[in-house]
């Protein structure tokens, strides 16, 4: 038996929790072309370890995308301001998990970034899941009833989901990030709960071979 180091100050309430892995896949912001469909794969980009007490606001902040930090303007003569970034011009998003659309109603950013924003010039956040829900209502023979909830007050332990089943985060209108949960287990003292969410891996900078379009280029 190997000796393992156990933290001395771990609250019993912390141990009475769960740990689950969140896998976020490569985003797609366009309809794949025929040559792309042949090699289309759901490629994991990031893996995070979450605890049951992790809030959906914290989980929402883990979705990073280059589309958020672009600016749809002529930058030759004008230096983009923070409010010019797509993240703030088109801030609406949602996460669809099981049968529920989780829709943010407020900006969840750092106080430093918030202090630089003129809220009177900000694009108001809207429920971009509404057109999808209306479309689903027309196809009741194919879809069951769905719910809509704000992400405030929701924790990972409150979610109803299936391990390994794909869910989706949508932002910028049509940019989709497929994600799923795996490796659910009970927490133990060796998990060091103060560091959650934990980044387990990041392969977002790896590029596929241009020939096979499947394996990582060497």
Features from the language model and the residues they span:
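Short linear regulatory motifs enriched in tryptophan with gly/pro/ser
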Residues: 1-218
